[in-house]
Amino acid sequence: SRSVAERLLSPSQVADVAAAMPARYRVLVLTAAWSGLRQGELLALTRADMDLDAFPARVMVRKAVRRTDAGEVRMDVPKTASSVRVVTLPEPLTDALRAHLEEFVAAELGALVFATSTGTTPARSNLGATWRRACAAAGVPHVRLHDLRHVAQVFAAEAGATLPELMARLGHATPAAALIYLHARTDRDAELTAALGAAMSRGSDGSTVTP
């Protein structure tokens, strides 16, 4: 399987791919990358699941889209009990969601947040093809749409999220998956090491360090 590093995008790359998506799906990309919701959770969101007037704004994850063996779309409970959660949103994403709701989402509380022009759940195959075209147009190395969940976990870890916070935010049932992302970026580790070195240098200025 691919390493975590092979599944990552930078914040600017996420913005570039989002800009290359059809307008209706741009904010879906941003929400995936900055909230960490699974694709099925994103596609199940309705107006009733969002509280953009709270501070910070938040979404309630309480259902997920599943596709049956017959190809039918069904709303189901999330993957695990820990997947039922409240996820807070950064302010720029909140602003983008407000604009998205106004332009693309029907007024009813049950209206899907990310839907086709007819208000139905987009087919994952179509969404995946659209995503691949956007990656190519943006000149971004191809990662899967699902990989935005991994991207979100690294963004949160780099922002200082602790292990319990990552588990709660991403809906992990065990620490194992979340731990991966606390160590995912070698460049971040290099930054940390450099900062430690600078602190050590400051501490030893004017003094002799003895073993």
Please give the residue ranges for each predicted region.
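Basic, Lys/Arg- and aromatic-enriched nucleic-acid-binding interface segment
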Residues: 1-45, 53-55, 66, 82-84, ...
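Short, basic (Lys/Arg/His-rich) helix/loop patches that form interaction surfaces
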Residues: 15-26, 35, 87, 95, ...
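C-terminal secondary-structure termini that scaffold catalytic or DNA-interacting sites
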Residues: 19, 65-93, 106-107, 116-119, ...
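Residue-level signal for well-ordered alpha-helical positions
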Residues: 20, 45, 99-103, 181-184, ...
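The DNA-recognition helices of helix-turn-helix-type DNA-binding domains
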Residues: 35, 49-50, 173, 184-188, ...
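Short, polar N-cap/turn motifs at the start of nucleic acid-interacting alpha helices
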Residues: 49-56, 142, 161-180, 204
